Amino acid sequence: MSVSNKLGDLASKVYENVLLEEVKKYPRPRHIGIITDGNRRYARNVGISENEGHVKGKEKVEEVVDWCMELDIRIVTFYAFSTENFRRSPEEVDFLFHLIDNAFKSLLKDERVYKNRINVKVIGNLSILPAYLRQTIHIVEETTKNFNNYQLNLAIGYGGREEILDAIKRITRDAMDGKLNIDELDEEKFRMYLYDGRIPDPDLILRTSGEERISNFLLWQSAYSELYFSDVYWPEFSKLDFLRAIYSYQRRQRRFGR
């Protein structure tokens, strides 16, 4: 590494530490939703396989969870696998499901989960996932269900429109069965028909890769979320990039439609 590169890295680290201390002075978001975009484009850019790009993306999720805990951000939701992702090749989908399955099994052995009492929850249409993955998800959720310091949500087999449509179907069935008075339905009752209505709405939604859209992610829940778009691909997303997103959020005035 050249002297200029070393100096650049040193300056970046100093700036990161300064920004970290600045961010700690102000209220942080309670809940962040993250659209982890750009694994495949990253892989093509650096000359590795797309599967290796997905592995790098999985490792980045683990890093970001640590960053969230460092800032006492209590809830984070990662958009891990959308319903649209089923359109990819069967080979890629199969690889992703096994990667996710192995990641969950690693969580069961990760002392950070137990030390920090991280509740792990999956949101999505689990019926469309492979049986082996559903079983692993069940074990992880059962193991961590009483942990309440932090919450790690993974949106898998998830689509925002599908979530709302599924909620409407369940509401219709309950109304027809006499379990629900449709005239008493309000936003709070409606949200309890979502995949997990207990999860607070995200304060901030962050997307990597330079794309500026939310791509069917938490459509109901993001009505008043702040949005932040980062130009870097997900595996390259650095702690400095993360701090910049939080700092940007802290400089905004949330109006909630007022």
UniProtKB/Swiss-Prot annotation:
Substrate binds at G38, N39, R40, R41, H54, S82, T83, E84, F86, R88, R207, R213, I214, S215. Pfam families: Prenyltransf. InterPro entries: UPP_synth-like, UPP_synth-like_CS, UPP_synth-like_sf. Catalyzes the sequential condensation of isopentenyl diphosphate (IPP) with geranylgeranyl diphosphate (GGPP) to yield (2Z,6Z,10Z,14Z,18Z,22Z,26Z,30E,34E,38E)-undecaprenyl diphosphate (tritrans,heptacis-UPP). It is probably the precursor of glycosyl carrier lipids. One of its GO terms (molecular function) is ditrans,polycis-polyprenyl diphosphate synthase [(2E,6E)-farnesyl diphosphate specific] activity. The keyword Transferase applies. One of its GO terms (biological process) is polyprenol biosynthetic process. This is Tritrans,polycis-undecaprenyl-diphosphate synthase (geranylgeranyl-diphosphate specific). Binds 2 magnesium ions per subunit. CDD domains: Cis_IPPS. It catalyses: geranylgeranyl diphosphate + 7 isopentenyl diphosphate = tri-trans,hepta-cis-undecaprenyl diphosphate + 7 diphosphate. The active site is at D37, N85 (proton acceptor). Homodimer. Mg(2+) binds at D37, E226. Keywords: Magnesium, Metal-binding, Transferase. Its EC number is 2.5.1.89. Its cofactor is Mg(2+). It comes from Thermoplasma acidophilum (strain ATCC 25905 / DSM 1728 / JCM 9062 / NBRC 15155 / AMRC-C165). It is an enzyme of class 2 (transferase). Belongs to the UPP synthase family.
